[in-house]
UniProtKB/Swiss-Prot annotation:
Protein name from the UniProt record: Troponin C, isotype alpha
Entry keyword set: Acetylation, Calcium, Metal-binding, Muscle protein, Repeat
Annotated CDD domains: EFh
Keyword Acetylation: yes
Length: 150
């Protein structure tokens, strides 16, 4: 985690907290994959599992923030904030099918399902409720950015 600056740690903490909906202090390995992919990291399932097994030092199958930050640092060390923002904006634009500056929670649900088909409807509801802070049923770019970068 030493290779991350304060801003990166803060962004990772916010992303971690967004998916740690029960505030248990850990996320699942599947969720790690979702967060990394939403941040623009291209990683195969096999490589992800390998990195997670190396990172999950206590072998709990649950990824605590420290473990998550160390894992993410391996991928973020080459990224800077501007590149991350650009990648997120591009990802958002692709899913903003109407070009009107927002995606519906239904589209976000589809994205999350694509990233991890093991998410249950309850998991998806919790994640979406956390992201769609104003309850509008839509996610604008600022809500999306806030979730991903703080």
């Amino acid at each position: 985690m030493d290779s991350l600056d304060e801003e990166q740690v803060s962004a990772l903490q916010k992303a971690f907290d967004s998916f740690d909906t029960d505030s248990k202090g850990f996320i699942t390995p599947e969720t790690v994959g979702i967060i990394l992919r939403m941040m623009g990291v291209k990683i195969s399932e096999r490589h992800l599992q390998q990195v997670i097994s190396e990172t999950d030092e206590d072998g709990s199958g649950e990824i605590e923030f420290e473990e998550f930050a160390e894992l993410a640092a391996k991928f973020l060390s080459e990224e800077d904030e501007e590149a991350l923002k650009k990648e997120l904006k591009e990802a958002f634009r692709i899913y903003d099918r109407g070009g009107d500056g927002y995606i519906t929670t239904q589209v976000l649900r589809e994205i999350l399902k694509e990233l991890d088909n093991r998410l249950t409807e309850d998991n998806l509801d919790e994640i979406i409720e956390e992201i769609d802070e104003d309850g509008s049923g839509t996610i604008d770019f600022m809500e999306f950015m806030k979730m991903m970068t703080g």
